[in-house]
Amino acid sequence: MRSILYAVLAFAVLARSSAVAAFPIPDESRPLSKTSPDTGATRSLRVEAQEVIQSGRGDGYGGFWKNVFPSTNKIIKKPDIKISKLIAAAKKAKAKMTKS
């Protein structure tokens, strides 16, 4: 157990020293770790066209992210598909296949 601790400690020291060696000027490594105040304030985890959908208990959808259809239709048009027509065509094709 102690040997694992020493190995992790040695790895951390080596990783730190190689990171410091990458930046010969000490002040050069600092701007990478700091965020600018304007980008830090405007960050958001949600995409503009998403909303949280809460569902009822036991229906299998425990709350999820869903795109709002009008905004996605601007990018990719949603085709008009009638499910009842597709089911009827599938039944007709299945009946034709079983007769042959």
Swiss-Prot record:
Residues 1-22 form the signal peptide. Keywords: Host cytoplasm, Host nucleus, Secreted, Signal, Virulence. Belongs to the RxLR effector family. One of its GO terms (cellular component) is extracellular region. The gene is SFI8. The keyword Signal applies. Effector that suppresses flg22-induced post-translational MAP kinase activation both tomato and Arabidopsis. The perception of highly conserved pathogen- or microbe-associated molecular patterns (PAMPs/MAMPs), such as flg22, triggers converging signaling pathways recruiting MAP kinase cascades and inducing transcriptional re-programming, yielding a generic antimicrobial response. Associates with calmodulin to interfere with plant defense-associated calcium signaling in hosts. Disulfide bonds: none annotated. This is RxLR effector protein SFI8. A motif (Calmodulin-binding motif) lies at residues 78-82. Interacts with the host calmodulin. A motif (RxLR-dEER) lies at residues 43-57. It is found in: Secreted; Host nucleus; Host cytoplasm. It comes from the Eukaryota. The RxLR-dEER motif acts to carry the protein into the host cell cytoplasm through binding to cell surface phosphatidylinositol-3-phosphate. The amino acids 78-82 in the C-terminal region of are important for binding to host calmodulin. The keyword Nucleotide-binding does not apply.
